Every structure is written in structure tokens, then in C-alpha cells.
Amino acid sequence: MTRKQRRMTIIGGSLAVLALAAALVLNALRDSIVFFSTPTMVAEKHVQAGKRFRLGGLVQPGSLQRGDNLAVSFEVADGNAKLPVAYKGILPDLFREGQGVVAEGALDANGVFKADTVLAKHDETYMPKDVADALKKQGHWKDDYGGKASDGVKPAATTAQGNPQGAVR
């Protein structure tokens, strides 16, 4: 075997081993790569009780029930299916019926998703309540904040420190 053939054999073997390792890692992480599963995906996969995963969807309007000691139950829906969720803890400020939510936990034997973490989702038009209140108080609030400005006015430029240019301190 010449030096070139030996070198090509080593490179080919190394690439084969690397491809096999990548395939094994991706296979092991297959279910973890998805950020969350929807109620429809959970129903189709027939998820085993006790297996941890993230559940995402919209909080079904009218399904929120508060119990004793911070216990909360609600349904997460995706348009096709809905899944009951039980959670014990303080809900995020953005949590509301009809809003997006991602819950982390596992299904119990009765098909109820027992969440130990609940995250409220918001869209790109979200503005923290404190900021919105401050803008309203100062008289700078516009109903279209968070969306595109209807009057064609662009937002003020900011400096590297994140302060508006020309801002009075």
C-alpha cells in the first residue's frame, strides 16, 4: 500500500467513525431536540407515564381552576387536542387563559400532565407592564406600541450603552 492509499484509508475510516458517533448522539437526543410537544403530538406518540418532556400550546379559555396551597389546574390545547395540566406553585405574571404556555413535567397514570415548571410565552409585541405604565404616565404611550408605527415614525436610535441618543438624564 502506498503512502497516499494509507492516508486515504485513515481519513475514510476516521470519517466513518465520526459519522457513526454523530448518528448515535442524534438518535439518543431525538426526543430532546424538540423544544416542546403539543397535545396532538403527545396523543399520537402515546407518551409513557413518568417520562419527562415539555408541553406547549395555548391555555384553554375557561379551564383555569385554582385550588388550595397554590395548586392550579388548566388545559393546554393546540386546536386539535387538549391535555389537562396540574401545577403547584406560583404562575408567571404573563400566564393567562388564551395565552401560550410551555410546561415541563411528566404524564401521570391518569393522563394528567403534572408540571413542575410553567413558562408563559409572549409574542414580539410584548412590553413589560412597568414600562407600559411608565409610558402611559408620561403621556408617551401609543396604542400601536409593539407593532409597526402607523405614522411612519422610526424609534429613536440608541447608543452602545442602550441609552436613547439625546436623552436627558
UniProtKB/Swiss-Prot annotation:
Source taxon at top rank: Bacteria
Major localisation: membrane
Keyword Ion transport: no
GO BP, sorted A to Z: cytochrome complex assembly
Residue ranges, Periplasmic side: 29-169
Keyword terms, alphabetized: Cell inner membrane, Cell membrane, Cytochrome c-type biogenesis, Heme, Iron, Membrane, Metal-binding, Signal-anchor, Transmembrane, Transmembrane helix
Span list, region Disordered: 143-169
Residues annotated for heme binding in this entry: H122, Y126
GO cellular component terms attached to this protein's record: plasma membrane
Keyword Metal-binding part of the UniProt annotation: yes
Transmembrane portions of the chain: 8-28
GO molecular function, one term: metal ion binding
A family per Pfam: CcmE
Protein's membrane topology: Single-pass type II membrane protein
Biased segments, Polar residues type: 158-169
Localization terms from the record: Cell inner membrane
InterPro entries the UniProt entry points to: CcmE, CcmE-like_sf, NA-bd_OB-fold
Membrane-side (Cytoplasmic) residue stretches: 1-7
Function: Heme chaperone required for the biogenesis of c-type cytochromes. Transiently binds heme delivered by CcmC and transfers the heme to apo-cytochromes in a process facilitated by CcmF and CcmH.
Similarity comment: family membership: Belongs to the CcmE/CycJ family.
NCBIfam families: PRK13254.1-1, PRK13254.1-3, PRK13254.1-5
HAMAP family with a match to the protein in the record: CcmE
Cited PANTHER family: CYTOCHROME C-TYPE BIOGENESIS PROTEIN CCME HOMOLOG, MITOCHONDRIAL (PTHR34128:SF2)
Name of the featured protein: Cytochrome c-type biogenesis protein CcmE
Gene expressing this chain: ccmE
